[in-house]
Regions:
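Active-site-adjacent betaalpha module
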Residues: 1-26, 68-161
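Short acidic, Gly/Ser-rich segments with clustered Asp/Glu that frequently serve as metal-coordination loops
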Residues: 32-42
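Von Willebrand factor
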Residues: 42-44, 49-70
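Anion (oxyanion) recognition and catalysis
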Residues: 51, 55-59, 108-113, 138, ...
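Thiotemplate assembly-line natural product biosynthesis machinery
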Residues: 159-183, 202-209, 230-233
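Phosphopantetheine carrier-protein modules
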Residues: 174-193, 210-218
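Phosphopantetheine-attachment site and its flanking helix in carrier
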Residues: 188-211, 227
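AMP-binding/adenylate-forming catalytic domain of the ANL superfamily
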Residues: 212-230
Length: 234
């Protein structure tokens, strides 16, 4: 069922390159329940990519909608309302490349041209079909993008006031330690929750890009949520 995800060089270049903005994005994940029930799902890079996308979206308060066939009508009604109330909405789609995925995509394309597929967060019947389908959507001028680039664009386009708010700081930290925000005590060392050097560097880069003056060394002097919030308020 699973196959090695294609490398960038194997995929047709994206012919549509409108700017992705976190404030306009809506993430659709199609058929995740089917994928999660497949043997060996937890060891797949695809599982990691979908989880990373979902966590980054939640950290930046981007709506995430899970779509499965049993709730299709209800979810599409909800999505239709969101798209009609926001003419700048951008729909980012990932998940199981099934007939349901293609049906959802056609419905969305009938409402907006701002549709992008996450090209390393979908599962086709085979690697060859995956590559061919990305080539087809490129030919149809539908944007495709990989997980890392999308997450970077989301973070870079998020409003500074949101990123540096107490809620924004909490959500970013929660994403990096893989916990629900309510689980993080403000005075407990974040290393106890699993914060590592990679997570620290990401957070420092994110906050500096939004105007904060902060170094990894300063953050690690007292790596608690409370201390970080105080540092970022200066």
């Amino acid at each position: 069922m699973f196959y090695p995800l294609p490398r960038k060089i194997q995929l047709a270049p994206s012919t549509s390159n409108w700017s992705i903005e976190s404030t306009h994005s809506i993430l659709l994940i199609v058929g995740l329940n089917e994928l999660e029930n497949a043997p060996d799902w937890m060891n797949q890079p695809l599982a990691d990519h979908l989880e990373m996308l979902s966590k980054r979206a939640q950290a930046l308060e981007i709506p995430v909608m899970m779509i499965q066939s049993s709730q299709l009508q209800q979810v599409m009604l909800q999505l239709g309302q969101q798209l009609s109330s926001n003419t700048q909405a951008q729909v980012i789609i990932a998940g199981n490349l099934s007939p349901l995925f293609k049906q959802v995509m056609q419905l969305v394309l009938s409402i907006t041209d701002y549709v992008a597929v996450v090209n390393d967060a979908i599962l086709a019947g085979s690697l060859e079909q995956h590559i061919q389908w990305i080539e087809k959507i490129s030919f149809d001028s539908i944007q495709h993008i990989n997980t890392q680039t999308l997450m970077r664009l989301w973070s870079l386009s998020a409003p500074s006031a949101q990123v540096l708010s107490d809620k924004g700081i909490l959500l970013a930290v929660a994403e990096q330690v893989g916990r629900h925000p309510m689980e993080i005590h403000p005075e407990i060392d974040l290393r106890n929750y699993g914060l590592d050097a990679v997570g620290v560097n990401y957070l420092v880069e994110l906050w500096r890009a939004n105007g904060a003056s902060l170094s990894a060394e300063e953050l690690m002097q007292t790596p608690t949520l409370q201390h970080i919030m105080q540092l970022l308020k200066h």
